[in-house]
């Protein structure tokens, strides 16, 4: 890289690398991040207990301290990940300067660059002002598209454009979206992709008519819980961010969601509520850090396209309910550590595309996998039928034959029971109970 000849670039890169290394080391020492649902429940318990201060405590002290420890660990992870993100951003900027052969300290060209930037800003501001003026004059403004304008700031006044249905400010330099955006009662489509957003405002949950939301390619580390209130959403794209988790209740609320893109993030798990998205048609979660899927994933009865590829060493198993995804047409499980497909995989009769590359599969055998999706379905279906037949055979055999004792204690219990029955019968006989006429005759003979 020619830029490394500049001392300022070299110094900045050295500092940035050191900071990145320190932040990563700290995160490694902290260990795995706690599960998001566990963090949510722990926070709720701590908050409820604090609210009852002075009253009777319903949570044992040991459990309460464990909840506080979970919350502290989560907050520590947040702090170090923020430091890591900031250091990586500096390193990326230094690397870009080195690739371009520039010195970070550019006194000669600074005035010209500033002047050019000022000119661009002025042009953008004029365009923004024109839109706002049109709205203030009472003229209908249903769609605003300010794409690739180097926009750094979105005025609060945008939240007062009544009747606005589409707002597209993709590929700009926005770091913040104003809270006032929650005032766009009629907004149906919001595109914020390819900006520099670190967070979204909680007021986004007020957009009750929002149908399409694209926040891909930003710097988001989480989505606000309020996003679950956007119940009209049918498409949500949050790909290419740094998401470590999704809101706990997202699936309970977004029941109309059809397409969900969360690939290229840092997700360790999907919330169990996602299984309630009965309208979900497409789920793309490739290139994350998923350790598994919710056990009830099979409840996604409308799912047709599922991409779970490239979760690498983390994804090893699929839940038993996977075979209930009866409408699945396309499935990508490549680049994982899956050893066996679920026994009921053969039930996926509508499956047309299947990618199992780069997995240590033993079931089905690789010679079957190499023959294609139809061969895999046929093999797994036959295996499933064999399993069902064997279970049925065992069930019939168990029903037709009495249960025999299989352990010494079982034999002893059965023997004692038999002796008790015999002795009871003998006592009854000798005491004269239940004697028939034939019994009396025998007594007379002796």
Swiss-Prot record:
UniProt-listed PROSITE patterns: LRR
LRR repeats: 138-160, 161-184, 185-207, 208-230, 232-254, 255-277, 279-300, 301-324, 325-347, 349-371
Protein's UniProt keywords contain Repeat: yes
InterPro entries found in the cross-reference section: Leu-rich_rpt (IPR001611), Leu-rich_rpt_typical-subtyp (IPR003591), LRR_dom_sf (IPR032675), LRR_domain-containing (IPR050216)
Tissue specificity as recorded in UniProt: Widely expressed.
Origin superkingdom: Eukaryota
Motif position, GVYW: 372-384
GO biological process: intracellular signal transduction
Keyword Repeat attributed: yes
Disruption phenotype: No visible phenotype.
Start and end residues of each stretch annotated as Disordered: 101-121
Coiled coil spans: 65-100
Keyword line: Coiled coil, Leucine-rich repeat, Repeat
Homology family: Belongs to the SHOC2 family.
Protein function: Leucine-rich repeat protein that likely mediates protein interactions, possibly in the context of signal transduction.
Protein name: Plant intracellular Ras-group-related LRR protein 3
Organism, as annotated: Oryza sativa subsp. japonica (Rice)
């Amino acid at each position: 890289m020619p830029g490394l000849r500049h001392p300022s670039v070299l110094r900045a890169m050295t500092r940035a690398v050191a900071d990145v290394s320190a932040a990563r080391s700290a995160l490694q020492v902290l260990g795995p991040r706690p599960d998001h649902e566990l963090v949510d429940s722990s926070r709720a318990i701590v908050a409820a207990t604090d609210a009852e201060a002075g009253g009777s405590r319903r949570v044992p002290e040991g459990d309460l301290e464990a909840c506080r420890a979970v919350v502290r660990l989560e907050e520590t992870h947040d702090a170090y990940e923020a430091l890591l993100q900031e250091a990586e951003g500096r390193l990326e900027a230094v690397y870009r300067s080195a690739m371009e052969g520039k010195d970070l300290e550019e006194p000669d060209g600074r005035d010209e660059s500033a002047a050019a930037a000022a000119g661009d800003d002025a042009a953008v501001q004029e365009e923004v002002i024109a839109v706002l003026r049109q709205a203030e004059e009472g003229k209908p403004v249903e769609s605003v598209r300010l794409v690739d304008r180097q926009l750094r700031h979105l005025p609060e006044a945008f939240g007062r454009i009544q009747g606005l249905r589409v707002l597209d400010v993709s590929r700009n330099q926005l770091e913040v979206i104003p809270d006032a955006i929650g005032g766009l009662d009629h907004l149906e489509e919001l595109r914020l992709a390819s900006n520099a957003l670190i967070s979204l405002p909680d007021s986004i949950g007020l957009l009750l008519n929002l149908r399409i939301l694209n926040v891909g390619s930003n710097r988001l580390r989480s989505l606000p819980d309020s996003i679950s209130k956007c119940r009209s959403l049918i498409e949500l794209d949050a790909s290419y961010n740094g998401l470590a988790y999704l809101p706990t209740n997202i699936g309970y609320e977004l029941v109309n969601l059809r397409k969900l893109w969360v690939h290229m993030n840092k997700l360790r798990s999907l919330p169990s509520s996602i299984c309630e998205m009965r309208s979900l048609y497409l789920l793309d979660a490739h290139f994350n850090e998923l350790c598994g899927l919710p056990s009830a994933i099979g409840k996604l009865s409308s799912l047709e396209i599922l991409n779970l590829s490239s979760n690498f060493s983390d994804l090893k198993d699929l839940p038993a309910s996977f075979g209930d995804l009866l409408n699945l047409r396309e499935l990508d499980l490549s680049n994982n550590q899956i050893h066996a497909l679920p026994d009921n995989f053969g039930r996926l009769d509508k499956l047309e595309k299947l990618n199992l590359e780069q997995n240590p599969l033993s079931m089905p055998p690789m010679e079957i996998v190499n023959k294609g999706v139809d061969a895999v379905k046929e093999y797994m279906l036959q295996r499933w039928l064999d399993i069902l037949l064997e279970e049925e055979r065992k069930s019939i055999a168990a029903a037709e034959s009495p249960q025999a004792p299989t352990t010494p204690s079982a034999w002893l219990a059965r023997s004692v029971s038999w002796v008790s029955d015999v002795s009871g019968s003998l006592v009854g006989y000798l005491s004269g109970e239940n004697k028939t006429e034939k019994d009396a005759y025998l007594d007379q003979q002796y």
